[in-house]
Amino acid sequence: MRDDAPELRGLLQALAQQTRPALEVIVVDNGSSDGSAELARAAGCTVLEHPVPGIAGAAAAGYDAARGDLIVRCDADSRPSPGWLAAHQHAHAHGAAGTVLVTGPGWFRLPRPWSGLVSAVYVGGYLLLTAAALAHAPAFGTTMSMPRRWWREARTTASRSPDVHDDMDLSFQVRPGERVRVRRAVGVSMSPRALRLDRGQLLRWRRAAYTLRRNWRRERPWERWRARCAAASGLGAGHREHDG
């Protein structure tokens, strides 16, 4: 988080209304100067100072500091419903063997019918195109969760470079035989600022392209698909769950 106090205030209010309270709320301050860190501290959050610019490094610092068995991540502009944390926990508790990531959709806070239409194109397009590159569904950083034990393994290969698309890069760490569950119950509303045609939009595309190049150097898309299909064929019919 960097200089996002107004959005953070709304998120903290939503987290305070959760039916299943969090063990802790960690806010990573990535060099803010607008009072965001002070706002988080006043709300009882654990604030980590991470002055080095970059989402991937800041996110990893938060994951490393987490004490709970389940790490749940969202963005400052996310607006989770009261049952959001409970839904993440339920998805892991009742998921198929090998579930390492749970994620869901995001809906832009726009007037109807634009909210549904634009969200379906933007978020749906991202999920489908990235799934083709990964050979499974990707994590959507606006609402995602993972067991801490899995992060301890994934952190050794996940990048902390400011040039990567962090949740896409994390998704590349999912191995054959591991699962990503996509659940509507963990979906959140979010700011439409990602739709702006500005420098931020260009930067996101550059990060995505860099992340694909970085990971495809290690494993080509068809190699990922082949390995995943081979792993799936060994699971048996009893595990044919359409989670990605």
Which residues fall in each region the model found?
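Short, acidic, metal-binding catalytic loop of nucleotide-sugar glycosyltransferases
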Residues: 14-22
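Short, flexible, basic/aromatic active-site loop/helix in glycosyltransferases
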Residues: 103-110, 115-137
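Acidic donor-binding loop at a coil-to-helix junction in glycosyltransferase catalytic cores
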Residues: 162-170
